[in-house]
Amino acid sequence: VKQQTIHLFVFDTLADWETGFAVAGLNNPAFQAQPGRFRVSTVGIGKAPVVTIGGVTILPDLAIDELAPEQSAMLILPGGGSWDEGGNTEALDLTKRFLAAGVPIAAICGATSGLARAGILDNLRHTSNAREYLAATGYRGAALYQDQPAVADGNVITASSTAPIEFAYEIFKKLDVYSAETLEAWFGLFKTGDAAYYGAMTQPANANA
């Protein structure tokens, strides 16, 4: 199986919890339909270290200007305060290049406001932290806002800051990370804490369906 790289955009103020479930599931071969198919790589505006909202220092694997869409299976954009300050415009330019090349992107929390400001959500069903939060950007897609934890429309996934599990679920579904049965068991386990779902995940038929 040819390994595919998922790129996680990293920047100062990144909200640690929002992409934790997604990147762990992608990078860890356990229970995957094709174990080891994905690896996660970090991309920064430059290659200087960044510090998350939780105080974790991350050294980006590469800079945005070194990344071409054809090298990637998906771009993940976490939330963080800098989006609301009008930052990360380089990541929005990269997002447009990804979508033009037919490569999916996934944005959560503040990153959705960045997409809204860039006009990317004007014609797509989407969600965010709140309808009013995106409306404040002055974007033209308000009629397509969905009051849901996470929404997938074509090659764009969006989610609320309080929905890291649903965000990961939509990413895993889009990329066929797990079999359908394993994906539902994974979601049930982390959403409810019911250990019975773990048993379903470990069934051989589910692990490699």
Identify what each model region corresponds to.
Residues K2-A15, F21, N28-I45, D61-A209:
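Active-site-adjacent pocket-lining segments in enzyme domains
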Residues G54-D61:
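Short gly/ser/thr-rich secondary-structure transition/capping motifs
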Residues T42-G54:
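Membrane-interfacial amphipathic helices and adjacent loop/beta segments
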